[in-house]
Amino acid sequence: KNRFTRALYGSHTAFRLETSDRPVFAAYTKKNPKHICFKLQTSGGTVALDSTEHCESRYTAGRRSYNLFHPSFEGGNLSIATLALPDKEGAIWQFNARNFKGSNPILLASISEIRNSKLNRNGDMGADPADSFEAPLQPQQLQSCPAQIDGTLYILLENQELRTLTTAEGETLFKKAEAARSETASRIRIETPDPYFNTLGGTLAMAADGIWDGEVWLHGAIGWRMPLSGWRAAYTGDVLGWHDRARTHFNAYAASQVTEVPNTLPHPAQDSALHLARSVKKWGTPQYSNGYICRNPHRNNQMHHYDMNLCYIDELLWHFKWTGDLDYVRQMWPVITRHLAWEKLNYDPDNDGLYDAYACIWASDALYYNSGAVTHSSAYNYRANKTAAQLAEKIGEDPTPYRNEAEKILKAMNERLWLPGKGHWAEYQDFMGHKRVHESAAVWTIYHAIDSETANPFQAYQATRYIDTAIPHIPVTAHGLKENGYATIATTNWLPYSWSVNNIAFAEVMHTALSYFQAGRAEAGYKLLKSSVLDGMYLGDSPGNFGQISFYDAARGECYRDFGDPIGVASRVLIQGLFGILPDALNQQIILRPGFPDDWDKASVSTPDISYRFTRKEDTDTYHITQRFQTPLHPVLQINARKEKIRSVKVNDVPATWQSIESAHGYPLLSIQAEGTSSTTITIEWEGAPLHTLAAQEPVIASNGKLALQIPSGASISQVYDPQSVLAKHTMGATAFNAQIKGEPGHHTFFVYTHQGEMDWWQPVNIYIENTRKAPSYTDFADIRPEKCRMIDFDRQLNASVTDIYQNEYLSPRSPYTTLQLPTQGIGEWCHPLLSATIDDSGLRSLVHHDTFQTSLGIPFRLKEKGNNILFTSLWDNYPDSSTISLSGTASHAYLLMAGSTNHMQCHIANGIIRIHYADGTSQATELINPDNWCPIEQDLYVDGKAFQVPAPRPYRLHLKSGKVSRDLGKELNITGVYGREIEGGAGILLDIPLDDSKELKGLTLETLSNDVVIGIMGITLQ
């Protein structure tokens, strides 16, 4: 177990003091990390302080404290407090001894080298061995520092050595360190009815200070402690009021933008040494030319493999909203325009308004879109162009090209990426092949589209409902946690696992929570945010941690502490989500849209820019706002209506008006505006009945079934908005709403326009449409009759050996543009461009006798002992797109032995299709969908029923090296772990397709639909 789990940061260097749940410590410097431990010698004996019978340990925003009791203390008590020094690399301990009998106790302090001298990620949790900071069994550099504790004792760590201090010297240093800690921690102060949230302000500020190196925001405070131009750490500067730090960061990376390398080399510019998976690092290519922002500050000659421009620019645009500094807008205008031109050149070269995503978000590793039209990157570019147009107007530049581009992007997103029948955005649309839409969206697709302001209120509500119903939720539980119903989320529902594709990552969870707040769904946002707070900050191994990966992540477990990405997002979700502070200093206003749970009767927040306090007493809500912006902004309070009428609204005791804003989250949204003064008090008095909800639960209805909703007394409805087309017909009366339901099975939403008292609002109605299609009356492979099996001979159509699949070069068709794409060997991705897998069918071939292989299920297949043994199809030019095999006679089942490739980018979409043709001209189709009935030949899917789910029963797979058949080949072959799960030799898949035995068969067509994959048939047996 890793005992060194809570780091304390002081100066803005890599130094940190590692603390534990018991008083044992480590001091990290890159060249000379140390282990520090203490013993206490008393008249009752000597005890190591990390072994006392009683230890109460606390972490308080940059300070670690302990309260110790032990039998040898004979009633005495030892308390310890430790801090990192604020102005140099070092730490200080304060020991207070009380009620010890006899002579004063003696503290025995020891410092030595650490056990693991070769740290991979600076000794971070989950990345380096758990015992890295323990003392060696035989220390070679042991230093001891004994001292008597006469009331209070101070120990100083300086230059990686321990020494005692005089009481006066110790008090001075300790007070100085405590004052610095307190100043940082108190810049964000939060008070709510939820005690789990009241610690967040100071803890967040300390973590944010830990990723500041004096010039830029870092990728992480511990592991990955390095500068990066992108990802979400830099949001924290403005949100937490460090506008000076924010500007320093933005200036440092503005100086890293390429300005003197024109694009002289055309698309595509792929790296042949890396099997065309990613762009070649060569100056003058579209990617490495003017506008590109390099990874390190003040260096515009250093290539990196991510597009970090998008996130950097988004953070910069938020900086303008926080400060309203038009002089700085003018200074940075060339940076923005070069960026926008660079994005267009690289990622929308066909000028269709939708952008490819080239490693432009944290979850980029293993993501590749092959020049596709991607929601999250298009959304980023929409907001950037829309905001650029607004900025241009303010500084006298031409806004037209940026406004036109923004309008073009939004129109294309709504026409091509929004799924009206499903109510969410697609992940992407293929550029190549059939240009199909990949509907199974990741959470980053939803939250980026909402965060970048591409959604109207109806879209935002529907899209967050997709997260409710389609994204895996993992319960957050703990012994003693009284409150139930908390759950964190996976980033996708994709298989197979690959790093950053399906993880439980704190920044992703919190950004999703932010999207709930932005969609008006405060209760859901609060519940998800609290689930993440409980998971990472209270139940995890590191108290107060803003870590990268959750304990609930099946692949990595709890990993990396105080990581830049979650610190930046936590800053936003807390300040901009829960407290709803949304400045627009460019337009001299600040929106306050609180996201408090309905049962909160008070809450307050204080930042360097603004404070506000909310109180509720019976029917009166009061908001007291204090601004500290350079020029006070006009507050615009946006709140959900509580009741059907408003008795009064007052601003600074003067009657004021309110307006209604269109919303779709289930409550009337009201807006109250005030003048820009340093202090504002807004009071709302409600009256009348509480607002009624038409459908609090989600009714389950059959397609073509009927829905009846009672309209409560005092309410009425006048309109219906049915964006998902689930209402075949409906009637609205004074007391009831009745509808006949149509549409695809699954979760759906429509909206009704509701009136009650003074309030008018759109109210969502969620329904679940049952699948009433006749379920198959069989279980696959449950009716095998070997004596009736007839093997099909299609030897002449066999065009490959199954072992060829990853031995080929798949060179065409390829995108004409620079992109991230599948490597030429047909497996891997841009982070693993040289990955391959050895397919070995020797065992299977050895079991073939007289062209027949007998499976353990009793089904025979015609296979070849030598030569070609599979008919491959693919959209790659290596094989035909489709192939038809002649059939005759009648049969009730077609048993297929198949093998081929797939990957996470082709999950939950038909990779291929099998069509059975009958002599009468009719046909039936079976789609091959990863992971339902199609799996990658080289690996076993990790399934845990949580983040990784597949329908039951799992398909039978056939081990090519041994001939074994199993629905759980991983268990059969003792495959462990989550990532890779290589099947030695590979495995095929068995399908049972029920047929209409009253019809004469004509043929079977296999067609590949997905661009990446190769799909083959090895054997067909009719029964």
Q: What residue spans do the PLM features occupy?
A:
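Beta-strand-rich N-terminal accessory domains
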Residues: 1-44, 201, 526-529, 771-820
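An extended acidic
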Residues: 1-68, 163-188, 193, 342, ...
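Non-catalytic C-terminal accessory modules of carbohydrate-active enzymes
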Residues: 30-34, 40-83, 88, 511-715
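Acidic, contiguous internal or C-terminal segments within carbohydrate-active enzymes
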Residues: 70-115, 610-616, 629-631, 877-895, ...
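Acidic/polar, glycine-enriched structural segments that form the non-catalytic walls/loops
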Residues: 73-79, 84-224, 243, 255-261, ...
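Substrate-binding groove/exosite segments of carbohydrate-active enzymes
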Residues: 181-331, 437-455, 459-462, 483-519, ...
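Catalytic cores of carbohydrate-active enzymes
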Residues: 264-269, 348-363, 370-376, 380-468, ...
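N-terminal/edge-of-domain interface segments
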Residues: 754-1023
